[in-house]
């Protein structure tokens, strides 16, 4: 019985912390003069709490595992909702594909450039420089 209560407490604590960060993000987003989704701000809050080790990762792991396990199921209502606009998607298929391709290329270039900027050129141990 104690083990079952402990497991319930771990899941409850994880979901309370996840929702607390979400609602804190929504509250902060409502105060900002620019439009940033509250869920994004909530994820940043959760990231900061975990990165600064204010919040132990083991406290949110049980809830995260449940959400990841059922993530595909959570996307079904969104997919059904998008299909209500099938005629709009069909009419705008070309521009949607072009914008997806261009944005993917831009993301590749930005990640490549930033990775090169952050990591720079590293020398391999035992390798001599270019000599001519």
Swiss-Prot record:
It is found in: Cell inner membrane. Keywords: Cell inner membrane, Cell membrane, Membrane, Transmembrane, Transmembrane helix. Pfam families: LrgA. One of its GO terms (cellular component) is plasma membrane. It is a multi-pass membrane protein. It comes from the Bacteria. InterPro entries: LrgA/CidA, Uncharacterised_UPF0299. The keyword Phosphoprotein does not apply. The chain crosses the membrane at residues 8-28, 31-51, 63-83, 93-113. Belongs to the UPF0299 family. This is UPF0299 membrane protein Ent638_2744. The lineage of its organism: Bacteria, Pseudomonadati, Pseudomonadota, Gammaproteobacteria, Enterobacterales.
């Amino acid at each position: 019985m104690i083990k079952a209560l402990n497991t319930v407490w771990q899941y409850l604590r994880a979901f309370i912390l996840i929702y607390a960060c979400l609602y804190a993000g929504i509250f902060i987003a409502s105060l900002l003069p620019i439009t940033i989704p509250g869920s994004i701000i909530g994820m940043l809050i959760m990231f900061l709490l975990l990165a600064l080790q204010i919040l132990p990762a083991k406290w949110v792991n049980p809830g995260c595992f449940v959400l990841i396990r059922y993530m595909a199921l959570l996307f079904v209502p969104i997919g059904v909702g998008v299909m209500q606009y099938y005629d709009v998607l069909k009419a705008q298929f070309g521009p949607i594909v072009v914008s997806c391709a261009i944005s993917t290329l831009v993301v590749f270039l930005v990640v490549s450039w930033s990775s090169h900027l952050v990591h720079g050129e590293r020398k391999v141990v035992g390798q001599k420089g270019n000599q001519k």
